[in-house]
Amino acid sequence: MKDLSRISVVLPSLDPDEKLNAVIDGLLEYGFTDIILVNDGSRAENLHYFTDAAAAHPEIHFLQHEVNRGKGAALKTAFTWFLANRPDGLGVITVDGDNQHHPADTRACCERMLETGHIVLGCRDFTLDNVPARSRFGNHVTSVVFRIFVGMTVSDTQTGLRAIPRDALEILTAVKGDRFEYETNMLLAMKDNGLPFEEVKIRTVYIEENASSHFHPIRDSWRIYKLILAHFFRYTLSSLTSALVDTAAFSLLGWVLRHWMEGFALTAAAGVGARIISSQLNFFLNKKLVFRSHASTGRAMLRYYCLAIPQMCIQVLLTQGVYALLHIADSQYVLRTLIYAVVMAVLYVVSYMIQQCWVFAPRKRGSQTQGVKS
């Protein structure tokens, strides 16, 4: 068993009950010696759970917010305190105060982090019978959306059990968000900064149908999905802008070049010229505004054109194939342009996923393992 003396447990809580004592007792029993307990503006009648625990256990350092600021703010308060006051600390592990994280799983996540130096997510199994239907459905949808629109495979996007090494913590403390959306922003920041992570399977515990959770299904879900879909929304705007430029250039070049070319040659020349113009605009919009990538411009541009050139060829061939199939004449400029735009729209979703996962992906800070350790 590994020494956990240089690992701090971050334990945020709002209006706790007696389960908080059980959480603390379990952590101490499993070898944790430093607990950062954060009161996130609890009501007066619940304060004694914090003060009693802090008085009874010298292993606890007690922090508090005068008013409720949200789970994200509570986590960042603890992270900031850890970085300033635990210079020899190797990392932290975040734990929820409702006793739904078994201390054995908490320890397992920490030991895995110490072995690999990676962020470790303790992930529940949502296929089990004891999982509430709304939790099973919500996590499944969020995981699918995350995989498609963010390019990350995370089986439990809302897990509160996260072991974070010190170097990653310095990055994640600066992430925006004060409430439940902070944990989603944390995952997005892990992707943007190339922070390696992996999953460890943990017990799936729901007490009283998760009644003690402070998660607001509509309000907090909206905050989370807004963050996840932001990349794709910006990509759509970038694509529409580039598509308008591309389509206008294709139409103009086709009108000009029709005096010297016809058939496939006309389609190819107009398509290539339009794509050269629009691709430069699209590259810089995507790099700076959509993916906000810090990847090397030269490397990203090389990858971008390794994608864009085959895509352009496929687009031209598909467009010309539709023209031939439907017997569209060279003089039917409006219809030709419409077909070209439709083909371009069909290809852009696949292009988005490749750009996100490869073209503008940051260099990883080590081997990223998204597998599951039992």
PLM segments and residue spans:
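Conserved donor nucleotide-binding strand/loop of the catalytic core
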Residues: T51-P87
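Conserved short acidic donor-positioning loop in nucleotide-sugar-dependent glycosyltransferases
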Residues: D15, D40-S42, R69, A78
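Acceptor/aglycone-binding surface of glycosyltransferases and processive sugar-polymer synthases
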Residues: V67, A73-F82, P103-F180, I207-F215, ...
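Short beta-strand-to-loop acidic/aromatic patch adjacent to the donor-nucleotide binding site
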Residues: D88-Q100
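A conserved acidic beta->alpha catalytic loop
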Residues: N39-F50, V67, N99-Q100
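Cell-envelope/extracellular polymer assembly enzymes that use nucleotide-activated donors
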Residues: R6-S8, D34, N185
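Hydrophobic helical membrane-anchoring modules
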Residues: M1-D3, V175-R258, R275-S279, N286-P310, ...
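Short, well-formed alpha-helical segments that are part of the catalytic scaffolds
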Residues: D15-E29, E45
